[in-house]
Every structure is written in structure tokens, then in C-alpha cells.
Amino acid sequence: MFSLRQPSEKDVRKFISSQQDLPFSYSQVGATQNQPPPGYTVDHNRTKLGEGEQTYQRAVSALKNWKQFDLGWVTIVPPGKLLEAGTTVAVQAKVFGFWSLNAARIVYLIDERQNLNARFGFAYGTLPDHVECGEERFTVEWHEDDSVWYDIYAFSRPQHPLVKLGSPIARRLQQRFVKDSLASIVKASR
């Protein structure tokens, strides 16, 4: 959904409601757990957040509160949605003076702790009213060497005709999102 004005809360509720029961817009649901499917652009980015349990806990809290989307030009609406498989959200973005809402649903959660390793995160997948088609995983990892990492892994391809037409611009916006998301979690974990 594109608009010249910011969508109201009512618009957001109506948009999410219209997408809530629809199937994912791609058939390889859950593929961010394994190998990405052919025919998609794959992005894998990570940054070291620091060391220790406090850093890990702060980063986990940041993910639970959607801080990786608290970027000024991109947000999750409605804010405060719980991380649960099946939850539908909208990614709201303002780019080039236009507002957009993009529907996504949480595919799976990760909450693992084994010996001195821990990992927390989730993946969401695109729904029919999203400009892209694919899946994105956000994880925080705490390794045996005490290092803590934030990892973003995604596969996608353009779905909306305007995004297909302007795919180089869309790729730059995806790269901007990654850079800003990494910076947001770095800041939140300190």
C-alpha cells in the first residue's frame, strides 16, 4: 500500500486485518533456517555487539521490542506486537515522500541455549501486500568466546511492479535498512 500521507492507526488495523489470513507470498516458508531457494537475492550481514551476558540480554530485549525497525524512516506497526509465530505486522516506511505499508508474518522463533552458546531471534515472511517477496531472519548470538553478534539473513526478490521497475533503488534501500538496523541494535545493546 502506497500513500502520500502517513497511514492512520485505523488504516494500519484495516491493512493488517486484510492480510492476516492470507498465505505467504512465496512457497519456501522457513527457508532461512537452511538453504535459500534459487531465484532470490540473498543478503547476510552481521556485526559484533560486544561481549558478555549483559550485552546479549540487552540485544535480546531490543529484538523483542522491534528496535531493529526503530529507524525513523522504517517502523513496525502497530508498535509493541509480541513476537509469536503467526503474528502479522506491517512494516511502515517513508521513502521519497511516499509512505508504504508492507505486510509480513512471523514464521518461527528461535530461543536456544546450549552450554555456553545462546541464540534468540525470529524470521518473518512476506504476505501478498508487500513490495518484496521472501523471508528475513533477525538473530542475536552469544558464542563460547563470550562474543555477542547481531545477524540479519534474508532472501528476497521484487514483487510489486514499481519495485521491479526500480530494482536498483530497491536494493539500495534494502542495504540502507541493513546498515541502519545493525546500528540500531549496536546502540540498544550498549
Task: Put a short name on every predicted segment.
Residues 1-95:
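Hydrophobic ligand-binding cavity/cleft-lining segments
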Residues 24, 45-47, 104, 122, ...:
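A broad, low-specificity signal marking well-ordered, structured residues that form hydrophobic/aromatic
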Residues 31, 111, 157:
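Residues that form or immediately flank small-molecule/cofactor binding pockets and catalytic motifs
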